[in-house]
Design a protein with these regions (language model features):
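A short interface-forming secondary-structure element
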Residues: 65-81, 116
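Polar/charged, Gly/Pro-rich intrinsically disordered segments
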Residues: 101-151
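A short, structured loop/turn motif at beta-sheet edges
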Residues: 57-62, 92-98, 106
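N-proximal, solvent-exposed amphipathic alpha-helical segments enriched in charged/polar residues
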Residues: 2-62, 69-74, 140-151
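Short, flexible coil/linker segments at or flanking structured domains
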Residues: 5, 12, 53, 82-90, ...
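Short, non-transmembrane amphipathic alpha-helical segments
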Residues: 75-97
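Structural recognition of the beta-strand scaffold that forms the well-ordered cores
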Residues: 64-65, 101
Length: 151
């Protein structure tokens, strides 16, 4: 049924290995300063089922995402994989975003655009096509060693 397919699609959007990058292309922006655009992007990426708050620093074009839960409660492997995915998506879609910090109760992680462009060997915006995204981003996230290089 249609409802069943919609439910399956919604569940797939909460996992970095099955997320549809096309679903967030409408949030592509040159600037980090648009609060509602940034919030809507993260509300449509993996970990969207965890309550979060945002803080944008327009001086250095950085973003802090404060997840209102613990890593232990969500699962460390899922958190690490999804944060790499969400960072790749955000750096790909927001042109002037330079750094993202993710805060959880008791722990935080920070990533930079250059760290991601070095890891993937290309400007991230060039990967914004579902086939290329699946090959270059999602397929690597299944490799724990690759994901751990970011931590």
């Amino acid at each position: 049924t249609i409802n069943h397919r919609q439910e399956q699609y919604a569940v797939a959007q909460t996992d970095s290995l099955t997320h549809d990058i096309n679903s967030v292309l409408k949030y592509k922006s040159q600037y980090i300063g648009d609060n509602s655009n940034t919030a809507n992007l993260f509300y449509n990426l993996p970990l969207n089922n965890v309550s979060m708050k945002f803080q944008i620093n327009s001086d250095d074009c950085s973003l802090t995402v404060n997840y209102l839960d613990t890593i232990w409660n969500i699962g460390e492997e899922k958190v690490q994989r999804d944060l790499v995915y969400n960072s790749a998506a955000a750096f790909s879609l927001i042109d002037n975003l330079t750094k993202i910090t993710y805060e959880f109760s008791g722990k935080s992680y920070s990533f930079t655009r250059s760290q991601f462009e070095n890891a993937f060997g290309t400007p991230l915006s060039s990967l914004l096509n579902q086939k290329v995204w699946s090959e270059k981003i999602q397929s690597k996230l299944d490799d724990t060693t690759f994901v751990e290089e970011f931590y």
